[in-house]
Structures are given as structure tokens and as C-alpha cells.
Swiss-Prot record:
Name of the protein in its database record: Probable tripeptidyl-peptidase SED2
Cited InterPro entries: Peptidase_S8/S53_dom, Peptidase_S8/S53_dom_sf, Peptidase_S8_Ser-AS, S53_propep, Sedolisin_dom, Tripeptidyl-peptidase_I
Entry-listed glycosylation sites: 265, 403, 572
Extent of the signal sequence: 1-16
GO aspect biological process, one term: proteolysis
Organism: Trichophyton verrucosum (strain HKI 0517)
Cofactors: Ca(2+)
Reaction(s) this enzyme catalyzes, per UniProt: Release of an N-terminal tripeptide from a polypeptide
Amino acid sequence: MRLLKFVCLLASVAAAKPTPGASHKVIEHLDFVPEGWQMVGAADPAAIIDFWLAIERENPEKLYDTIYDVSTPGRAQYGKHLKREELDDLLRPRVETSESIISWLTNGGVNPQHIRDEGDWVKFSTNVKTAEKLMNTRFNVFKDNLNSVSKIRTLEYSVPVAISAHVQMIQPTTLFGRQKPQNSLILNPLTKDLESMSVEEFAASQCRSLVTTACLRELYGLGDRVTQARDDNRIGVSGFLEEYAQYRDLELFLSRFEPSAKGFNFSEGLIAGGKNTQGGPGSSTEANLDMQYVVGLSHKAKVTYYSTAGRGPLVPDLSQPSQASNNNEPYLEQLRYLVKLPKNQLPSVLTTSYGETEQSLPASYTKATCDLFAQLGTMGVSVIFSSGDTGPGSSCQTNDGKNATRFNPIYPASCPFVTSIGGTVGTGPERAVSFSSGGFSDRFPCPQYQDNAVKGYLKILGNQWSGLFDPNGRAFPDIAAQGSNYAVYDKGRMTGVSGTSASAPAMAAIIAQLNDFRLAKGSPVLGFLNPWIYSKGFSGFTDIVDGGSRGCTGYDIYSGLKAKKVPYASWNATKGWDPVTGFGTPNFQALTKVLP
């Protein structure tokens, strides 16, 4: 039986990957059908797929030099964020490069009306038959063995040698999967005694029993401060996976916890067919959580809910063995939409509470999307991500066929151009919450801005967990905020929600408050935060030295499948930066004194 299964596997791989000719070069390749998936047959030749092609930049350092120049206090260009046209000029490939790619597509049968040249990216739509000829591959239908969802994908694709040096990636091709909201626990409706507490009682509780905007204002030194209504201080909230923010629930939340904000609302940015449907049985908890705390803590700021259709891709591992049926790429769709907005329409803060294991995405995809976060940073956007809810890891094994024991960093939290937010719990003192993800990237090297801080932690750590992580990788999270038992109105009822998905929007609102403080003094918004945080801003955060994360328990917390067990696996909160709470939680008054 095992031999038969192995022969069938070889047959499926062979069917999925034709032999590339001498005139083609392989761009991406999977050695085997990802675990949990089965090839069930050839794709319909007439099926239409929307592709994104990322053009390899001739001088990638130009983007990195620019983001550090405009984001590092003390440099001559600090705060001089680029306009969209300036960013386009920075990234625009040579004319002959673009022409060669467009020519390849049109000569290969793609309708010119279905090609959109966006400078360093090209979007094109075509049918499976044409795509197979273009990329010298065969697209097949792959079925998820857990939920019978099917996807059109391939295990390998190629492009002509003549243009191969210009092609960083084409997707969706080899990507299997989805994102997850980073909310580790959704509680039942709250007890009557909590529901009946007054706003003043919640503030006095200092977030011990339930987190509300009142206690966060008290805990983090915001007081009654509100932002001013300005066009140059906008907040964007990311929405994926058909999560829809409900206006009625926001109204209930503000009436209950922020009565002075009653009547304030948010606008919608609908991307690639995204919706924000009101009412109905669909999921809204994550979207409501994000919107209620962003609006509640900065209610005069202009807030936009960016709802993007589709579900993100991955190469499945034990943490994420399944996905929904949709060929769109939401991160790419959202990011390409945002970087093309005029600078006066961009959010100055973008908060996202979604992520996946870093290893579940091909390296070309993580690099391309991380560079898009950097592009937003050059235009003055502070990109905020939750760090994740699996501690050092959940499955704690590699998905390369070796199943080696390994901690699992979370992406996009591990991208060096985002600010990653860990979680805390309790007060007097705050402690690291056990589910707060953190660690070290296996994809991105440690950026110079955090080199000294991370070296200090590694010296304390010594040889513990040696071999389970890359000590030279980008370390995360950067900072933290409360992450346990947030009061949220969902479908008309108050519910408690935990996860770093709560920490991220709370921090985003505080960053918007800092931007408001700077703008009132004639200074620009903060933009990409990390160079400032690691050089000076860290002194405005309360260091968390108690508690720690946990993970690698032997069972994956999402799928329930048996996984690698690492006894006592944890990152501990320590003095200074640590990979569970970063530099700690915000003290608004202290932060205003160390702003650039």
C-alpha cells in the first residue's frame, strides 16, 4: 500500500511539471504536492486566472536606501516622504525591460486589453491554455483533503531565458493557501456584572478584568486626548477573508465606551471586488474589533476600512492545511491599490491583524510583498502588523519534506519594513501574554536598526533553543500592547476577544495620536517607525520583564494535528528588547518627549 501511494505521488508530480526546454528557465519550483493536497486532474483550459508579475529591479538597494533615508532620525532626508510620482520614478524599470515582458505576453496570446503595466508590476488575465504555453507548465486542479476545496495551481513554471532575469515571480501559480486573523480566542458573551460596569469603572479597573478604550487610555497615558480631523492623518484598517465591519456594532460600542465619540464613523475602500456587507450571518468579529478600537481611541481621525476580496496563498503546513476557493491574491491586490493612491489619500497608519507562518509562502512572494510594505513606508505610512498568536511556534516543524523541528516565525510580522506588535496581559505590572508570537525570521536578515538590541537579548539567551531558529534573522515583535479579553460588540452583543489582533489596532490608534501631536507642531507624520523606535523611541515604552510565550506543545493549535513537541518552548520577557513583547508597551506622555 505504501509503495502504491508513493508511485501515485510520483505520477501526480510528473503530470504537474513538464520538462522545461532549453529556451526556458524555471522561476519557481515545488518538489512535491504540498501536504494535505491531492492533484485530481487537469484544469479547464478555458478557466480565467488573474496573474501578477513582479519585475526584478536592477538596483534593489535604491528602495532600501530611500526608506532608511526618510525614516531614520538625524539623516538629512528624514521626514521628506516621497510622493507617488517620485516613488514611481524610483522603481520604474527600463523601457526595454517592460517592452520585452509585454511583448512576451502579447506574442504568447494574452489580449493586450487584459494587460496592465504598473511599472515594476504587470497584471494580466488569461485562460489556462494560454498560461500553460506562456509558462511552459501544466495547471492542474488540486483538492484540499480536509475540506474538499479545489484550486488551480502548478508545481513549477518557467519563462523564456531572454526575459528570465527580469521576472521575480508570477502568482498565483505555486501558492496554496490562506491567511488567518491573529485572534487566538473568541470568548462567549460576557457576564452581567461586566456588562453593567460604567465607563469610569472600566477605566479604574486598568484592564484587569476586561480591556476597553477607557482602561487603555488610562493605562497608556492618553487620557481624554482625541486627534483632530485632518486630511494628512488618516488611518487604514485592513479587511480580508470576507470580514465586514458593522456600522451598527460600532455605534453600540461608542455609545457604551466612548460616548463623546458617538456619531463618528468610518469610510470604505473596496478593493478588487471587496465588500462591506451589513447584517447577515457572516463573520465580523475581527473587523469589528479593529474598527471599534481604532475609531474609539482616535475618533476624529479619518478612518478607512480597506476590504479586499479573495483569500491569500500558502504552501500548506500543519498550521494551515486548508484554504477557501478563490484565485485572488489579497495582499498583492491591497498593496498595489495603496501604493497607487495619491499621497494625500494614503493612510498615515495602516493596521493589519492577519498573518501566516513564514515558511508557508515561497521566498519570492515574501520578498515582493515585503518590498511593497517598504514602498508604503517611503510615502510616510506606518505599517502595523500583529505578531501572531502561536508563541515560538505551533506545528514547530519545517514543511520542506524533512519535517525538521523548527520554531515558526510569522509573516508579514517578520518583514523588516513593518512594525510588529506583540501582546501583554494584566497590570501592575503588565506581563507578556502566553500566546504572543515572536522570534527570528528565516527569510530576512537582521536589519541594522535592531542589531544592537537583538545582540543584547541573544547574549542573555545563550545556547538555549540553538538550532531551532536563525539568530541572524530579523527579530520580532518590535513593541507590544494589551492583547487579552477586549470588549467588542459583535452582532449586537458584547463579546470578549483575545489575540495580538487586538494589540495592533490599539497601537495604530496611539501612533495616529503621535502623528497628530507632530502635525500640530508643523512636523511630518512618523512614517516607518522602526529606525526611530530602536534609536531613541524605545525609552518611551514601558519595558515588560515578566511572563513569556509558550508553544510547540506537540499539537498544532489550529488544525489539531499531531506536531513536534519542544518541552518548555518559550521566549521570555526580559530587560530590554525581547522576542515576545519587543521594547514593551506605550507611554504616550513619555513618547511625546522622545519624538524626532
